[in-house]
Every structure is written in structure tokens, then in C-alpha cells.
């Protein structure tokens, strides 16, 4: 109504037709309760045939916006889907390192590491079936893109395979730099404090320019990955948020 705009699209969470949502990619509306209510009112008629459960938008301060909508009758609720965590590469490289000379990163084959990655995730799903709702392994095509940039590695401990780590140059969320595309350790090597060491080794491999960041999105339930990111110095700089306007069902 005020001449603003919002770039949106209908999407389905993990391709599940029962979980449609409106993805707000960009907008002139501010990331405030008033701005989000304006977007919801404007897009609801256009996407009503799909019966979307929620909006999803990237917002800069998740705790602040959640507090701001609490008690606001225009919203049923709001929650974090994925945290955006980032740090400048040159600063992360200067932080105190976790020393573990057993661990190395070795360039690997996309096909072989994709199969290994799928096996790691399969084992995780068997232990925690709920994880399959929000965590999916990077496939051979995705890992091949990382390999093309020299940023696909097998994690080796005592020269034995231990997992997969991959990154990609990707400018997003207002940042230039590299995205952590994958970090998966097999069961034998999880919960041993190796995650931060892998990230520190990865930082040394990045062909980073001044001002480049290492960033990634981490699901709010993925506590080990959140801890690893914080331990190497990355910070929460935003989040992909589920926003449930009044009259919408909400994302389960």
C-alpha cells in the first residue's frame, strides 16, 4: 500500500507438499513487526491456493524480533529455523587454535565423499529420526562444485577416514566470502572436540581476500554445530525465521 515491494515465492519444506511456506527473499519493508505484518497482509491472497503454513524471512536479530512480536495479536508465533553464523576469515585465523596433530584435510573425490557423507547421515538418522526433517547431506553435484574450487576435503585422523568438510565461495547475507557447505564426522570421531579443529584447518585452506567472511547456516537444534561455530569465533549475525501471522497454521 505504501509503494513498497516484496520478492517472495512458494516453497515446500524439504519438498514435502504438506509443508508449504512463503519464502520472503527480499523486501523494502523493515525487519520489524509492522514490516512483517505488512508483508503478510500483502502476500496472503496471492499464495492462498497453496495454503501456506508460515512465512520465512532472514532477519538480523532473532532474539530481538521474537521479543518484539510477543503479545502482538497480528502474529501467532515466531521461531528460528536456521541461524546464520559468520566471522571474518582473517580474525578467525588469529584466534587461539585447538591443537590436534592427528587431524588432516585431504582433497577428495566428490563421488566417494558423497557416498561417505550419505552413510554418515544415514547413521545419524537411525539414532535420531527427527534429524531427517532438518538435516540433509550434500550430494555429489554439490560437492563437485566445492571440489572445483579446491575446497572439498576428506577429514582424516591418524590417516584414517573420519568425515567430510566442504566450502564454497558464496556471497550472501550481505557478506563476501565462503560458506561452510558440509561438515560431517563419523560416529567414531564425533563428540571428541574435533569439529572446531576441522574448521580451523579449513580456514587455512580458504583463498580469502581482506574482508571475506566464513559463514554458514546452522539449524537451531544442531547444538554440536552451533558450539563448534562459536568455539572458532563465528557469531550469530542473523537467522532464517519462521513467522506465523494470525490465521496461519504455523510450520510444524
Residue spans for each PLM region:
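Short amphipathic alpha-helix that is part of the acyltransferase structural core
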Residues: 94-138
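Conserved beta-strand-loop-alpha-helix junction that forms the acyl-donor binding cleft
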Residues: 57-64, 215-226, 230, 242-247
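Conserved acetyl-CoA-binding loop-helix of GNAT-fold acetyltransferases
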Residues: 34-44, 185, 191-208, 226-231
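Conserved donor-binding loop and adjoining core beta-sheet/short helix segment
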Residues: 1-50, 60, 165-187
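Acyl-donor-binding surface of acyltransferase catalytic domains
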Residues: 27-112
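Conserved catalytic-core motifs of GNAT/GCN5-like acyltransferases
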Residues: 77-89, 235-249
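Actinobacteria-biased recognition of intrinsically disordered, low-complexity terminal regions
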Residues: 14, 247-252
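A conserved beta-strand-loop-helix scaffold within acyl/acetyltransferase catalytic domains
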Residues: 129-183, 187
Amino acid at each position: 500500500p505504501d509503494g513498497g515491494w516484496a520478492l517472495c515465492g512458494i516453497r515446500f519444506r524439504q519438498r514435502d507438499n504438506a509443508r508449504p511456506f512463503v519464502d520472503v527473499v527480499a523486501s523494502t519493508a523493515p525487519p520489524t513487526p509492522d514490516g512483517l505484518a505488512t508483508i503478510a497482509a500483502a502476500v496472503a491472497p496471492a499464495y492462498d491456493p497453496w495454503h501456506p503454513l508460515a512465512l520465512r524471512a532472514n532477519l538480523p536479530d532473532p532474539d530481538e524480533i521474537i521479543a518484539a512480536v510477543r503479545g502482538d495479536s497480528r502474529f501467532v508465533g515466531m521461531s528460528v529455523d536456521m541461524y546464520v553464523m559468520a566471522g571474518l576469515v582473517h580474525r578467525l585465523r588469529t584466534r587461539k587454535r585447538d591443537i590436534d596433530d592427528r587431524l588432516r584435510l585431504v582433497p577428495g573425490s566428490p563421488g566417494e565423499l558423497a557416498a561417505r557423507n550419505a552413510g554418515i547421515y544415514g547413521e545419524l538418522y537411525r539414532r535420531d529420526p527427527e534429524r531427517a526433517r532438518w538435516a540433509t547431506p550434500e550430494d555429489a553435484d554439490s560437492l563437485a562444485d566445492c571440489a572445483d574450487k579446491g575446497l572439498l576435503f576428506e577429514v582424516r585422523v591418524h590417516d584414517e577416514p573420519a568425515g567430510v568438510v566442504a566450502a564454497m565461495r558464496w556471497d550472501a547475507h550481505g557478506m563476501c566470502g565462503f560458506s561452510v557447505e558440509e561438515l560431517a564426522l563419523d560416529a567414531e570421531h564425533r563428540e571428541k572436540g574435533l569439529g572446531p579443529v576441522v574448521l580451523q584447518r579449513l580456514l587455512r585452506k580458504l583463498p580469502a581476500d581482506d574482508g571475506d567472511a566464513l559463514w554458514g547456516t546452522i539449524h537451531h537444534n544442531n547444538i554440536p554445530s552451533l558450539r563448534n561455530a562459536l568455539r572458532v569465533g563465528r557469531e550469530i549475525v542473523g537467522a532464517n525465521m519462521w513467522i506465523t501471522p494470525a490465521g496461519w497454521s504455523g510450520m510444524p
